[in-house]
Amino acid sequence: MANYFNTLNLRQKLDQLGRCRFMDREEFADEANFLKGKKIVIVGCGAQGLNQGLNMRDSGLDISYALRPEAIAEKRASFQRATENGFKVGTYEELIPTADLVVNLTPDKQHSKVVADVMPLMKKDSAFGYSHGFNIVEVGEEIRKDITVVMVAPKCPGTEVREEYKRGFGVPTLIAVHPENDPKGEGLAIAKAWAAATGGHKAGVLESSFVAEVKSDLMGEQTILCGMLQAGSIVCYDKLVADGKDPAYAGKLIQYGWETITEALKQGGITLMMDRLSNSAKLRAFELAEQIKKSLGFLYYKHMDDIVSGHFSATMMADWENDDKDLFAWREATGKTAFENAPKYDGKISEQEYFDNGVLMIAMVKAGVELAFDAMVASGIYEESAYYESLHELPLIANTIARKRLYEMNVVISDTAEYGNYLFSNVATPILAKEIIPNLQKGDLGEPTPAVEVDNITLRAVNDAIRNHPVELIGQELRGYMTDMKRIAVAG
């Protein structure tokens, strides 16, 4: 198999990268009806598999789970999750032959094996679904031509897919139809019904492409969503301790700080996050963000280039063949960092204190979001997709750090995201430690920024620069579709 994207000519590549249309709510008037009465079999019962299945069942669809015989016989976690929630469970041979839609929600590295096992069992003119297009785009998987291939990709972890649905809402979602596999022209109808069944249509759906989803998703998770948070956590904690701060306080400030400051990001973008600061602190955060951009800009664009070319995927798949040697080594090293082993702090940190004492962290968020967004757009990805894969998902990932620090983040995200995170953070961490940390001033981290005289012209120019960045302009529009967003709990 060959990387699908690299088999396309330039016109086709640009067309696929630029597929992005925000769908009108009226297009989902039929909701999940197209799939009602059809048999839907989900392969895999992890976070996405279970929670999408629960939502789809509650939307009136016929859902069952196909698991490997050993998972059933040994009553593994996937079997227990499915059966404890009252789902029918069977082997591939028992369930796949009668399925109208088979949804593959296993980890990326298992996709080729799953396809090889289930495709011979699938009935003629059935459909096959993904929630991430890596197997199609990067691996170059070829699916039988009578099978319709679609994607529904919720832009958040599986647990949030369920929680938002239970509230009567949903999470923003990308849908796509593989252009090589839509023999009956039903792909879009299938994807729309599936998205509606998960609740995604209530938060906004982008009609995209497998290519655009994969390239933007990989970029976001490697850089701002995971890599920048990991690098920032490590260097900020080390700096606080080096400055004599209580290690327990430093650990809590970082662990819960990302979640608290990005909650403002979720509700009102970078503008609101920066508005939580005093004028003096805002100007300093803006200055620090510009310095971070200069230091890390090349790394963001390198990751984007490596993703588009397929170099990243080839490197990671080589590690798959080597039994994930690099992945496991990097995971172990992360577990040994000082931040991961910081003592517990029982004192209270107010919401505003996270902002006042975390100016450097805010600067990292601002710089990281803007760099990731700009790199994606410069590579042909539309602004809507770039927004969802940078700013929108950041509070959700920050929430995982609040639960159990970097360990939890790396457990929740996919192995693909985790591998990319390490590639980025392993380079970004020493750069930040060498070029940014030594030049910090009093009040950049761990204590409030001293008040200085601020002139109106400078403040106006900074405010204009913040509010008029393209990620803020498109974000204001897209957040209008998400007016019922749940507020993530802020720790005390």
Curated annotation (Swiss-Prot):
Which cofactor is recorded for it? Answer: Mg(2+)
InterPro entries given for it? Answer: 6-PGluconate_DH-like_C_sf (IPR008927), 6PGD_dom2 (IPR013328), KARI (IPR013023), KARI_C (IPR000506), KARI_N (IPR013116), NAD(P)-bd_dom_sf (IPR036291)
One example GO MF annotation: magnesium ion binding
Q: Which SUPFAM superfamilies match?
A: 6-phosphogluconate dehydrogenase C-terminal domain-like, NAD(P)-binding Rossmann-fold domains
Enzyme Commission no: 1.1.1.86
Instruction: Give the cofactor note.
Output: Binds 2 magnesium ions per subunit.
Keyword tags: Amino-acid biosynthesis, Branched-chain amino acid biosynthesis, Magnesium, Metal-binding, NADP, Oxidoreductase, Repeat
Similarity comment: Belongs to the ketol-acid reductoisomerase family.
Q: What is this protein called?
A: Ketol-acid reductoisomerase (NADP(+))
Gene source species = Haemophilus influenzae (strain PittGG)
